[in-house]
């Protein structure tokens, strides 16, 4: 056994295995298989190839590393501890998966220093890695000058069979290959084991051939514990400047633990005390003491970290010279990284200007996008092959492509799930604001990655058009019903449904000024009138558009989007019958709920119990505002194929029906 300890690299690799196994055992839950199987890959990359600096985790030109298989989080935490990121102590590893610890079950962005993205849903990290690689190429094309490669780094992702089974990886890698993202290097932990058993039961395709078809260079490491072979693979990946690279590393899940390695049982449960003891004996580890790491191993990692500093020092020197030689680029750089940029440039009269003609809110949003792109040069975005319909094309900004990384219009293709992960990755990279777009009914395809946006606090903007039965002729498959309620239910998410130009401008202003909350806009296909009384108060989520002349209104009509005009017209008709109502616009329930109780009570006073909510989607969620005595005019079934002018009356979205329902209270 002693011969296994004569190599400091081997000891350093095994330190990752031991810390991972002990932390998972102490927590009584976790996934030891990946950390044990991929320890050699991670060590070789982090110690000898990754451009990073634990002393400055936010260095802008660092390489990015994404653990797409987030269940293997102890691999990442062990690395962060051994490399000294954020002073992550051994005691933090001992608190793995515990309340309030720095080591949650899956890596969480902004929670643990050195974690580049929240991962856990398999394949998500692959999509975000593609987004980061896109951001790197775009920023490089904007800022680099001859002799000054101020943006020049790689994005690495590590995932396993599960990541490769998930459809999002195919979506993302298909686009990455098309875009020739040569700064993207993906490690495939090919251990041929899934939770239910061998991958032979459900996953027998030739993954390498698939990746070749996507346009990747493919490299195979036959021995996942051979550091030299792994290192050569990384260098070969870097040498290809025309294609992204996919490195298949043949590993053994749970490597080092005799009773578990190569078995499905190594994946998602603690190894057990006896098996950990046997593992340490097998690895020649000098102590059975939990979490023990020899001082010589810590010293070795410290030496590695000291060796990482010169790369950043050289970059800092180059960047200082660059800023002196190109002061206009330094100013632009600061603009890209200014988190308060939108507040400074998107609050002028022209930004909020509108004309009185009726228009679809998707068209009004398109105008806002083009106003924003002129004010914010760091905005990049696009649609899932729908920009002509969602009105998301930025004029005169070019298309992002393998031939033009400076383009600001992204063509994501029909890949909504990957599009959203890529949008997250673009923003996680830093320096850019991103938006993504599709039809509202297909927002379902974006949901898992949008959920990560909310969890991470990444203020990605979603442009969802064709927002109700107003879609009309395309029928129920294309008419959203339950989607609005779903998005409103998401924590840390602002779901806007604006009614006219003023509210659309407010929704966009809220989106681009948001620091930690993603925002979505649900926009109409059909034209809507400009409404008297809408204002910037829409930024509060809900507000009084037209009030009653009485101190206490006879009733309150609440509406959003295309139905606000119905509410306003109903108010006029009711007034003729001596019923004086208040009209409240509710473009964003989420923001309204963030207001003070005093403000909410002012808009919706508790002593006015006669309330009607009007919205051409599911009525789910409106109960909190109309109460037991109120009424909801909404959709309780799927739509139909017909002109919207036929559908709205059929389903009760008319002035006459709103008036009748108010009178019936």
Question: What kind of feature is each model-predicted range?
Answer:
Residues 26, 58, 154-155, 215-218, ...:
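Short, surface-exposed connector motifs at secondary-structure boundaries
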Residues 27, 63-64, 115-118, 148-166, ...:
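A short, small-residue-rich loop immediately preceding and capping a beta-strand
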Residues 86-114, 196, 214, 379-407, ...:
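Anionic-ligand anchoring segments at beta-strand to alpha-helix junctions in alpha/beta enzyme folds, i.e.
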Residues 98-110, 134, 138-142, 147-152, ...:
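Thiamine diphosphate
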